Amino acid sequence: MNAVLSVQGASAPVKKKSFFSKFTRLNMLRLARAVIPAAVLMMFFPQLAMAAQGQDLMASGNTTVKATFGKDSSVVKWVVLAEVLVGAVMYMMTKNVKFLAGFAIISVFIAVGMAVVGL
């Protein structure tokens, strides 16, 4: 006959490491060793670090982007239509009003995002 012994009850608590345990002296030295060379290079070559005399390589595509995603483009209309359809279908499936009103919230986010970007 085989006997099986089992111990039941609370196990020993496992201590969770503190967030501040990452800020040890050794870790700070490692961080300094990684950051100081980059800081020295940026100090000696500031024009490379800040791209002061840089040329905008994407400027030629501004008209294409505005034509594709601008206020009067068909892409924005199709995205809004897809939002309305998905919101309606999700509302019919779940009967949750959040899905029905979600398209309005997403439309506001899209309008604000396009205004911020400049489209």
UniProtKB/Swiss-Prot annotation:
It holds the Pfam family TraA. GO terms for cellular component: extracellular region; plasma membrane. Monomer. Interacts with itself to form filaments; also interacts with TraQ. The gene is traA. The modification N-acetylalanine is found at A52. Residues 1-51 form a propeptide. The chain crosses the membrane at residues 74-94, 99-119. Residues 95-98 are cytoplasmic. Residues 1-73 are periplasmic. It is a multi-pass membrane protein. It comes from the Bacteria. This is Pilin. It is found in: Cell inner membrane; Secreted. Disulfide bonds: none annotated. Belongs to the TraA family. Keywords: Acetylation, Cell inner membrane, Cell membrane, Conjugation, Membrane, Plasmid, Secreted, Transmembrane, Transmembrane helix. Propilin is the precursor of the pilus subunit, pilin, that forms conjugative pili, the filamentous surface appendages required for cell-to-cell contact during the earlier stages of bacterial conjugation, and that retract after contact is established. Mature pilin is assembled with the help of TraQ and TraX. The keyword Lipid metabolism does not apply. Its main location: membrane.
